[in-house]
Amino acid sequence: MIGRTPKLSELVLGETAEALSLHCDEALENLSDDDEEDHQDRQVFIERPYAVSVPCKRCRQTISFVCVCAPEAIRTLNRLLSASLSLVCPECCN
């Protein structure tokens, strides 16, 4: 950082985000019949990492990030990015 006040351009890191596997390979064991029925009754949302790349609204440079969410949430994000939501890269924020 140069000077007394930080600037966004000085805070941008040059490293790129990498998708990591967050899946757990453990299995549930020794469930009683009641536990199995209760588990089946509940709707289970599995959150997974999704790599997202979109163009900057101003300069069209690719903005990439990874988010962890349920499949329905990533579909909602896709609809928003396809319709009314736009992102701006750090360089264009100034």
From Swiss-Prot:
Post-translational modification: Highly phosphorylated.
Gene Ontology molecular function: DNA binding; DNA-binding transcription factor activity; protein domain specific binding; zinc ion binding
SUPFAM superfamilies linked to this entry: E7 C-terminal domain-like
Key word Zinc present: yes
Entry-linked InterPro entries: Papilloma_E7 (IPR000148)
Region feature (E7 terminal domain): 1-42
The protein's assembly and partners: Homodimer. Homooligomer. Interacts with host RB1; this interaction induces dissociation of RB1-E2F1 complex thereby disrupting RB1 activity. Interacts with host EP300; this interaction represses EP300 transcriptional activity. Interacts with protein E2; this interaction inhibits E7 oncogenic activity. Interacts with host TMEM173/STING; this interaction impairs the ability of TMEM173/STING to sense cytosolic DNA and promote the production of type I interferon (IFN-alpha and IFN-beta).
Domain comment as written in the entry: The E7 terminal domain is an intrinsically disordered domain, whose flexibility and conformational transitions confer target adaptability to the oncoprotein. It allows adaptation to a variety of protein targets and exposes the PEST degradation sequence that regulates its turnover in the cell.
Protein name, entry field: Protein E7
Organism, scientific name: Cottontail rabbit papillomavirus (strain Kansas)
Source organism phylogeny: Viruses, Monodnaviria, Shotokuvirae, Cossaviricota, Papovaviricetes
